[in-house]
């Protein structure tokens, strides 16, 4: 993220879910999922952010 968008940081908005905000089968309940966005919350970056996550084997 920092190499692609200088000054933009990765934001983790949720990892573990114990309040039931995700679907019943969500990996958040096992601590094996994470919701992420960028610090500028620019939705136009989300597709590339998803690609970067896949490339990083996340």
Swiss-Prot record:
Family to which this protein belongs: Belongs to the hedgehog family.
Protein name: Indian hedgehog protein
Residues that, per the record, bind Zn(2+): 28, 35
UniProt gene name: ihh
Domain of life: Eukaryota
Keywords (A to Z) from UniProt: Autocatalytic cleavage, Calcium, Cell membrane, Developmental protein, Hydrolase, Lipoprotein, Membrane, Metal-binding, Palmitate, Protease, Secreted, Zinc
Binding site for Ca(2+) 1: 13-14
Record comment regarding domains: The indian hedgehog protein N-product binds calcium and zinc ions; this stabilizes the protein fold and is essential for protein-protein interactions mediated by this domain.
Gene Ontology CC terms: extracellular space; plasma membrane
Compartments, record wording: Cell membrane; Secreted, Extracellular space
Record note on modification: The C-terminal domain displays an autoproteolysis activity and a cholesterol transferase activity. Both activities result in the cleavage of the full-length protein and covalent attachment of a cholesterol moiety to the C-terminal of the newly generated N-terminal fragment (N-product). The N-product is the active species in both local and long-range signaling, whereas the C-product has no signaling activity.
Function, as annotated: Intercellular signal essential for a variety of patterning events during development.
Main subcellular location: membrane
GO BP terms: cell fate specification; cell-cell signaling; proteolysis; regulation of gene expression; smoothened signaling pathway
Example of a GO MF term: calcium ion binding
Binding site for Ca(2+) 2: 14, 17, 19
């Amino acid at each position: 993220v920092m190499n692609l968008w200088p000054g933009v940081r990765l934001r983790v908005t949720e990892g573990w879910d114990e309040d039931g905000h995700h679907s019943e089968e969500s990996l958040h309940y096992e601590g094996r999922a994470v919701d992420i966005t960028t610090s500028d919350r620019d939705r136009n970056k989300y597709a590339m952010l998803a690609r970067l996550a896949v490339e990083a084997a996340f």
